[in-house]
Amino acid sequence: MSFETFKFTPEINKAITESGYTEPTPIQKKSIPEILQNKHVLASAQTGTGKTAAFVLPILELLHQDKNKVRGPRVLIVSPTRELANQITDSVRKYARHLNINSATVVGGMSYKLQNKLLSKPLDILIATPGRLLDLFKQGKIKFKDTKIMVLDEADKMLDMGFVPDIRKIFNATTKQQQMLMFSATLDNSVSKIASEFLSNPITISIKPDTKGHSNIQQSLYYVDNQFHKQQLLKHFLADTNLNQAIIFTATKRQADKLTDDLYHSDFKTAALHGDM
């Protein structure tokens, strides 16, 4: 299957090609057709499997098809952390580069003056963290009457971080007629319970992780004093002459890019690999 199967508008297909992608991932293959049919979706897949593009791409297609001009936001994407919200923003900008789509991000740590300026203009997509979004709503800076799609990204993290009460208040401020999408790395009873509160007859999609064990992997735990100590210890291990290749996992895409740059300048032949590439 190729991305052309989804019959995206040429502008979206062009952005996908420019990003170097040729074939959708399993979560994208199953989620995109359902979202394009305006269905509620509850989807689960491991981190790094293309979950963000699984909802961003069909959302952009639906926005492109809808020519009605409203103040917006027409799409509301809620993420548990500032960093994850910024990653979604990067993805939206990448795939919407050839479309006339307006997006903005409001997260904690940004000045209210800047965010108020962003919200003063018509918006197609708003990406936000729960606390700041609820705060701006209470101030009357944003309304959800035009919101047609609402995405809850990393739902399991939202549960862990105690954001459900905020999400509930935000949801209750909408028309409750919007298409609801919920994406999560895990799909346990607590996530399913929250989904039953916000989603109506959702299509449930679960991509099972590869859990095969490997007996030839040795595991060790090292304690470090700080970030600098961790970096130096990592470089010490990588300098081992018996080591030919290594794979280093980071928590976020930005950390992967930063570590790649640091190791490159320390004379290690290094390359990053993540979902934005």
Task: Mark where each language-model region is.
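Conserved helicase RecA-like core
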Residues: 2-277
